[in-house]
Amino acid sequence: MNGVDINSNLDSIKAKAEDIRNLLLTTSTGNWEDILGHFVVLSGEYGSLVREVNNIYDSVAVFPEQVTGDPNLIPNLLRTKLSPELETKNRDIINQYVSKNSTHYDPGNQEENIPPLKLHIKSFNDRIDKVDQEFENKIQQISKHKLTKPSASHDTAILKDILSITMLGSGIKINAQQQLAQQQQQQATINALQQQQRLLNAQQQQQQQQQPQALYKLPATNTANTSTNTPSSTIVINSPSPGGIHHNVPTPPTNLNAAGTRTSPPNVQQYVNSPPPQQQQQQQINTVIGTPNTIPTTPTATVSTAATYKPVASPQQQVTSKQVPIQSTNKPLPQQQPSIQIQPQQSIVQMVQNVLPNTTSPPVNNNNQSPINSGIGGGQFKPSAINIANANSGTSTIQQQIQLQQQQLQQQIQLQQQLAQQQQQNQQNQQNQQNQQNQQNQQIHQHIQHLTPQQQAQLQQQMLQQQQLQQQFQQQQLSQQLLQQQQLHQQQQPNQTIQNPFHNFQANNFRVQNPTNFNPPQNQ
C-alpha cells in the first residue's frame, strides 16, 4: 500500500468530470475537438488509476497453504479433480464398456482372441480411411471454388494513358515538331538505303571490268595453200590449275592493220602470271597456318592457234630438265617456328623467253602470208602450230610434281615443329634444374653455418663431385640432341632437291620457223 496515492487520482478524476459536465451545460453548440481533448485527459487519468489498483491486488492476493480432505470446503478454482458425482458416473461407464467386451476377449484362450481383434482393427482402419477420404473431397471442392486474386500483368502507367486517350482524347494529336522529326527520320533511312544500293552497283561494275574476257576472236585459216582468209572463229583453251581447279587464262591475239603491220597486245604477262582467285585464297590460308607463301604458279598454255596444224620440231633443239636446289638454312630461332625459303617458279612465258634467242621478226612473204598470230613475247615471234595434247599432258605432270612438293614441305614443317617442341622442353627442364640447384644451395648454406671447418671441407668435396656428375649428364644430353639433329638433317637432305616442274616442257613447240619455207600440211 506504500507509494500509492489513490486519493489524488480520484480527486483529479472528479474535477475533470465536473469540468466536462459544466462544459456540456454551458455550450449549446459543442466543438468536437474540445470534447475529444477532454475525454483523452479523462481516459489517461483512468488508466493511471487502474495501474495503481493492480499494484494493490498484488499485495492483497492470498492462497491456502494446507488443503483439507473434504472437497466441499475447497473452492472450485483450486480443485485438481472432478466432483464425486462425475467420478462415479465415469466409473460406471467404464465398467459397462468392459463388461460388454469381456465376452469377446478371453485371456485364457489367446488363439480365439486373435480373429475378433483383427476384425476390430480392420473396421477401425476402414472408418479412419473414410474420414480421410471425406476430408480430401471437401478440400478439393474448396480449392475448386476458391477465388484467386487476378495478377496485374499490365503496367498501370500504360492503363492510365489508355484511359486518358479514350475518355479525354489526350495524346492523339501530334505536334508539328514531332511530324517534322518523323519525316526527317524516314528521309534519312531512304537516303541511306539508296546510297548502299549505289555502292553495291559500283562494286559490281568494277568487278565486271576487272574480270578478263574469256573469249577472243582469232582469224581462221584455210586448209589450201592460198592467201585468202575465212571468217573469224573463236577458240578457247582451258589450262587446269593445281588441285583440280580449272581456270580460263586466255591470251589476247596480236592485231593486223590494213598495211599488214603488227600491233602489240594489251600486257600479256598481266593475265598469264596472275594466279586465279582460288589460288590466292589458298595462299592466304597457308599464311595463316604457317606454310610458306611462295607456291609455284601454274603453267598456263597461252596459245591461240588452229588445231588442224601439226608442230614442226627439230631434234637438235630441246630443253633438258634440271633440278633446282633449295636454299634453306637449318637454324631455327629459339621458341619460334623456322621459316622455309623456296625459290618461286617461273611462268611459261618467262621460260620461253629465256630459252628462245632474241631474234627479230623475219620479213613477211606476201605470197605465203600466215594469218596466225600469237600473244607470246608481246608480238615479237610468230611460232608455228602447237600440239595442245602435249601441253595438257605437261600440265598434268606439273600438277603431280607440285603436289609432291607440297607433301615434302609439310613433312619438313612437321619435323621442324618437333624440333622446336623438343627445344622448348629442354629449356623448361634446364630452368627446373637451375631452380632446384638454387634451392639446394640455399639449404646447404643454411646448414654450413652450424658446421665445423672439417665438415665444411667434406661438404665442398661432395658438392664438387655432384657438379662433375651433372656436367657429364648434360654433355650426354647435348650429344644425344646433336645426333637427333643430324638424323633429321639427313632425312631432310633428299627432300631438299625438288625437280623443275618444267622438265617435260619442250621448247620446240614454241620455236620460230622460217615463214618463207613454211608450208602448212593439209587436213587428213
Swiss-Prot record:
Comp. bias regions, Polar residues: 314-333
The keyword Ubl conjugation is annotated on this UniProt entry: no
Name of the protein: Putative mediator of RNA polymerase II transcription subunit 8
Main localization of the protein described in the UniProt heading: nucleus
Subunit structure: Component of the Mediator complex. May be part of a multisubunit E3 ubiquitin-protein ligase complex.
Pathway(s) of this molecule: Protein modification; protein ubiquitination
Upper lineage: Eukaryota, Amoebozoa, Evosea, Eumycetozoa, Dictyostelia
Segments of skewed composition (Low complexity): 356-374
Species of origin: Dictyostelium discoideum (Social amoeba)
GO biological process: protein ubiquitination
Annotated family: Belongs to the Mediator complex subunit 8 family.
Function according to Swiss-Prot or TrEMBL: Component of the Mediator complex, a coactivator involved in the regulated transcription of nearly all RNA polymerase II-dependent genes. Mediator functions as a bridge to convey information from gene-specific regulatory proteins to the basal RNA polymerase II transcription machinery. Mediator is recruited to promoters by direct interactions with regulatory proteins and serves as a scaffold for the assembly of a functional preinitiation complex with RNA polymerase II and the general transcription factors.
Subcellular location field: Nucleus
Annotated stretches, region: Disordered: 312-340, 356-379, 430-451
Coiled coil residues, start to end: 117-146, 175-211, 398-478
Domain of life of the organism encoding this protein: Eukaryota
GO CC terms, sorted: nucleus
UniProt keywords, alphabetically: Activator, Coiled coil, Nucleus, Transcription, Transcription regulation, Ubl conjugation pathway
